[in-house]
C-alpha cells in the first residue's frame, strides 16, 4: 500500500485514514487488522473491542 492511500483529500483539507503509532510517533502508521491495530516497526499492538 502506498503512502498516498493513507490520506484523503477533500477540497482544501487533508485527513489521515490511519492512526500513528503512539510509541514511534508521527510518520509511522498502525496496520489495521481484523481484530487489532499493530505497528510493524516497534511491535506495539492495540486490540479492537
Curated annotation (Swiss-Prot):
GO molecular function terms noted in the UniProt entry: structural constituent of ribosome; zinc ion binding
Chain positions of all zinc fingers (C4-type): 21-42
Residues annotated as binding Zn(2+): 21, 24, 39, 42
Matching Pfam families: Ribosomal_S27
Keyword annotations: Metal-binding, Ribonucleoprotein, Ribosomal protein, Zinc, Zinc-finger
Record-level GO BP terms: translation
Cofactor(s) required, per the database record: Zn(2+)
Any Gene Ontology CC annotation: ribosome
Note on how the cofactor is bound: Binds 1 zinc ion per subunit.
InterPro entries reported for this sequence: Ribosomal_eS31, Ribosomal_eS31_arc, Ribosomal_zn-bd
Top-level taxonomic group: Archaea
Family annotation (SUPFAM superfamilies): Zn-binding ribosomal proteins (SSF57829)
NCBIfam families named among the record's database cross-references: PRK00432.1
Family note: Belongs to the eukaryotic ribosomal protein eS31 family.
HAMAP family, alphabetized: Ribosomal_eS31
Subunit structure comment from the entry: Part of the 30S ribosomal subunit.
The protein's name in its UniProt record: Small ribosomal subunit protein eS31
Species of provenance: Methanosarcina acetivorans (strain ATCC 35395 / DSM 2834 / JCM 12185 / C2A)
Amino acid at each position: 500500500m502506498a503512502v498516498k492511500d493513507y490520506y484523503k483529500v477533500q477540497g482544501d483539507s487533508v485527513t489521515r485514514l490511519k492512526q500513528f503509532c503512539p510509541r514511534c510517533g508521527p510518520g509511522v502508521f498502525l496496520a489495521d487488522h481484523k481484530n487489532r491495530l499493530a505497528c510493524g516497526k516497534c511491535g506495539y499492538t492495540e486490540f479492537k473491542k
